[in-house]
UniProtKB/Swiss-Prot annotation:
Active site: 167
Keywords, ordered alphabetically: Exonuclease, Hydrolase, Nuclease
The keyword Metal-binding belongs to this UniProt entry's keyword annotation: no
Name of the protein in its database record: Oligoribonuclease
Lineage per the UniProt record: Eukaryota, Viridiplantae, Streptophyta, Embryophyta, Tracheophyta
Protein purpose: 3'-to-5' exoribonuclease specific for small oligoribonucleotides.
EC code: 3.1.15.-
Residues covered by the Exonuclease domain: 46-210
Enzyme type, top EC level: hydrolase
Family per similarity comment: Belongs to the oligoribonuclease family.
Amino acid sequence: MNKLSNAFSVLAFADEDAPMASSSSTGKQEESVNGSLEDGDYKQPLVWIDLEMTGLNVEVDRILEIACIITNGDLTQSVEGPDLVVRQTKDCLDKMDDWCQTHHGASGLTKKVLLSAITEREAEQKVIEFVKKHVGSGNPLLAGNSVYVDFLFLKKYMPELAALFPHILVDVSSVKALCARWFPIERRKAPAKKNNHRAMDDIRESIKELKYYKKTIFKARR
């Protein structure tokens, strides 16, 4: 869900060493981008979630797709999680605005939604299981692009999943907005996005974008 630009989200820091309410099981190894990690071995974890919806009005619109990737705080390790298309009715899809009709139709998502047998509740439980497995005792922060909108939809339609996260969000859109004002040259060199408007693709692009800002703008400690 990359079409919003959020210049007003507040960036803050939390005690990320505080334990989660529920910890994951341990023992099984999971492959990551940089090798294998024990379950729950992601330090200062970021839980990247992206939703595709029928629109942006949380009171009437519904979730069509949810994807999740977990990284450590340094963005050097990651594991890809569920990438789920959620069943919604044809009547629900017919009420989408022109933008959603066009883009979700072109991406193939609309057709996949009608063929899916996964409910919102089932999708929520699969993502919760994945997050708890890999976060362990860490206190995860929700991350993404304009992720405050995704968080609103999670609170309404997937409240148990939303409850895993504090109010602090790692919003790449906010970082981008600040870089455009303070480091405009570097901002213009940020990786271009394909804007496929599919949840997992959007997360991968968001992580790539934040890695660029980390390397280019947020200098390493001396």
